[in-house]
Design a protein with these regions (language model features):
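Hydrophobic anchor at the beta1->P-loop junction of P-loop NTPases
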Residues: 9
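P-loop (Walker A) phosphate-binding loop of NTP-binding proteins
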Residues: 12
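Conserved lysine of the Walker
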Residues: 17
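Hydrophobic positions on the alpha1 helix immediately C-terminal to the Walker A/P-loop
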Residues: 20
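Post-Walker A helix-loop "phosphate-sensing" segment adjacent to the P-loop in P-loop NTPases
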Residues: 26-36
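ATP-dependent small-molecule kinase phosphotransfer cores
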Residues: 40-114
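A glycine- and Lys/Arg-enriched "phosphate-lid" helix/loop adjacent to the NTP-binding pocket
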Residues: 103-168
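Phosphate-binding beta-loop-alpha motif at adenosine-nucleotide cofactor sites
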Residues: 129-130, 134-135, 154-157, 175-190
Length: 218
């Protein structure tokens, strides 16, 4: 490829997405792949202002405010696309923790089709592989509750809302043909699925051992 392979991992809260991303990174690096790990939130220089707007939206839910949040996020992704993604080594694999697919879970009044169009109009880079990480909502809710930071969400506060956002996200995965990764078993199982798909996109014939790394590149 003449540019890095760009892979996004998205999903509702508590699905083990960040842990999975770390495990995928480890396995790919064990197979001598150059991996760049990014986080949308940490790469966004405007996140403080956006989160202030998200907090306002949480207190006063309305479509206009939510659309403003969507616009700010799309503008930030355009900035990341132009100023961060383009600076990575051409022979690398970029794994990013959240990108525009996450809006399918967290936006409540704006149809995702409109959000997707907005991001495309902003020239946000389209991932070469979208990975949607999901679990049964009861499992992810319990996982989130057991974390030190809890659910850690501003938009989603109630179990019923979490169930609804999980259902919306899974529907978006189906509608757009993204990779669905059910992370209800071991992290090794989910890691093997994701790494195997990345190798498939790269056109590599690789035997994957999620514990030992990638072996046998053809």
């Amino acid at each position: 490829m003449n540019r890095p392979l760009f892979v996004s991992l998205d999903g509702p809260k508590g699905t083990g997405k960040t842990t999975l991303l770390e495990a995928v990174t480890q396995v790919l690096r064990a197979g001598n792949q150059k991996v760049i790990r990014l986080c949308e939130r940490k790469s966004d220089p405007f996140r403080g202002e956006t989160m202030a707007l998200v907090n306002t939206l949480a207190r006063n839910p309305c479509r206009d405010l939510e659309w403003a949040v969507c616009q700010r996020l799309a503008d930030s992704r355009r900035w990341i696309s132009q100023n961060v993604l383009t600076k990575q080594p051409l022979d690398s694999i970029i794994l990013i923790d959240r990108w525009y697919p996450s809006d399918a879970a967290f936006r409540q009044t704006i149809p995702f089709a409109e959000i997707l169009q907005l991001n495309m109009e902003r020239d946000v880079r389209v991932p070469d592989l979208h990975v949607g990480v999901v679990t049964d909502p009861d499992i992810s809710w319990a996982r989130a509750a057991n974390r030190s930071r809890g659910l850690g969400g501003t938009v989603i506060q109630k179990h019923a809302e979490h169930v609804a956002c999980t259902e919306m996200f899974e529907q978006a995965v189906k509608d757009h043909g993204w990779m669905l990764c059910r992370n209800e078993g071991t992290v090794e199982e989910a890691t093997m699925l994701v790494v195997s798909r990345i190798h498939e996109v790269l056109g590599l014939n690789v035997e994957v051992d999620a514990r030992l790394g990638a072996q046998g590149i053809a």
